[in-house]
Amino acid sequence: MIKIVSLINCKFNNANILDGSTSKVIKIPLSLSNLNREIMKLLLTGCTGFIGRELIPSLIKEGHSLTVISRQSKGQLKTIANDQDINFIQMNPAESSSWNKEEIQNALKSCEGVINLAGEPIAEKRWTDAHCKEITNSRLETTKNLIKNLRNLKKSPKVLINASAIGFYGSNPQTEFTEENIPGNDFLANLCKEWESIAKNKPRATRLLIVRIGIVLAKDGGALGKMLPIFRAGLGGPIGDGKQWMSWIHRTDLCNLINASIKNSAWSGVVNGVAPNPVRMNEFSNSLGQVLGRPSLLAVP
């Protein structure tokens, strides 16, 4: 793991990482707090999983009109929001023919903003050749198809928020990385580099913000969701020697970052979606153990 910081100057509150309602929630700078509450028609890809469980309700709360496209069934979406709040289109966005449907073309023509988080989860399965291919295609082919269709529109959306990952920087644990650093040269770094390059072919009139997302934490899933049962059983501890950096972000912060990015036309380019102060794995494990009243002694190889 590597140490990632962001050059974006947002202030955070100090709070418990286990509680999304009081986690280190981004304070929107004063220049943003006075913005009018612009209601937009948004098209979302890849938002029916761990991040989407909080992102979609937060966008609905802001008053945005949502069209969500996903390979998942509509039943999966019902666990996130009510049917009446969302226009749902089931399709595989990595297949170019899926974009020919009248329903998705109409949604594209009317959308004012796009949030592209599509991608097979990286940490859920072993990295077999087949899974690495799925990780790659679900991101690159989806984004290629999205960009191609956006460029064909007579009226371009105002903004495209495209996911990337801190894996962009490779795996040098001795270096502190900011948005200005060059990419690494391993599988994830090359994937993120190509993913971002495709997104940059967006329509000229569309503002692009690429969010290089860190390790996303929330108690109902992701890395923290896997760690909590182990720690609660008294079997928790750091991974490896505990000296590796953990550049994390709470899911609530990430959703706030995306919401703020929609509103603020001054935000473009690349931002590291991480908390301002990365921690060593030892420190994170010790803090988690203290919060739960459990030991953090058993290192995971």
Predicted regions and their residues:
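Catalytic helix-loop patch of NAD(P)-dependent Rossmann-fold dehydrogenases
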Residues: 137, 141, 171-210
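NAD(P)H-binding glycine-rich loop region in Rossmannoid oxidoreductase-like domains
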Residues: 87-142
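Mid/C-terminal beta-alpha module of Rossmann-like enzyme folds, strongest
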Residues: 261-301
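NAD(P)-dependent short-chain dehydrogenase/reductase
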Residues: 189, 193, 203, 207-210, ...
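Alpha-helical substrate-binding/gating segment
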Residues: 228-236, 244-278
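N-terminal Rossmann NAD(P)H-binding glycine-rich loop of SDR-like oxidoreductase domains
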Residues: 42-62
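Conserved Rossmann-fold NAD(P)-dependent oxidoreductase catalytic core, especially the SDR/UDP-sugar
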Residues: 132-134, 144-186
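N-terminal Rossmann-fold cofactor-binding loop
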Residues: 69-74
